């Protein structure tokens, strides 16, 4: 693995440990070069309560690797999380910088009604 990836994974592990101590439901984000994925995971980490990604049929047709697609994923995951009864989450950025697509997804999820 590259040093950049190892560093990102170390940051993610530290953040997840803190979220586990707080027993918080978390909104976990992963981004690849072409897609972005978001999951709302239960406090004990055993169950996915809601999820959305640019691979969903509703979002697959348009561009999938840009800020606009991330905003749509954020709105969709917020809508699905509220339907599952979740309104308060901890934002798990998986070690990625809070910038660009990750920030756009987080802002859209907040606008959709999730509290971080």
From Swiss-Prot:
Pfam families: Ribosomal_L18p (PF00861). InterPro entries: Ribosomal_uL18_bac-type, Ribosomal_uL18_bac/euk. GO terms for molecular function: 5S rRNA binding; structural constituent of ribosome. GO terms for cellular component: cytosolic large ribosomal subunit. One of its GO terms (biological process) is translation. The keyword RNA-binding applies. Keywords: Ribonucleoprotein, Ribosomal protein, RNA-binding, rRNA-binding. NCBIfam families: L18_bact. Belongs to the universal ribosomal protein uL18 family. Part of the 50S ribosomal subunit; part of the 5S rRNA/L5/L18/L25 subcomplex. Contacts the 5S and 23S rRNAs. This is one of the proteins that bind and probably mediate the attachment of the 5S RNA into the large ribosomal subunit, where it forms part of the central protuberance. This is Large ribosomal subunit protein uL18.
């Amino acid at each position: 693995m590259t040093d950049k990836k190892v560093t990102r994974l170390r940051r993610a592990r530290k953040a997840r440990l803190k979220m586990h101590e707080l027993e918080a439901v978390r909104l976990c984000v992963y981004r690849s070069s072409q897609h972005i994925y978001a999951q709302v995971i239960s406090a004990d980490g055993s169950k996915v309560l809601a999820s959305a990604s640019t691979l969903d049929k509703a979002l697959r047709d348009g561009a999938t690797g840009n800020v606009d697609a991330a905003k749509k994923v954020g709105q969709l995951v917020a809508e699905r999380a509220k339907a599952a009864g979740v309104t308060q989450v901890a934002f798990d950025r998986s070690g990625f910088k809070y910038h660009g697509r990750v920030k756009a997804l987080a802002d859209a999820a907040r606008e959709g009604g999730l509290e971080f």
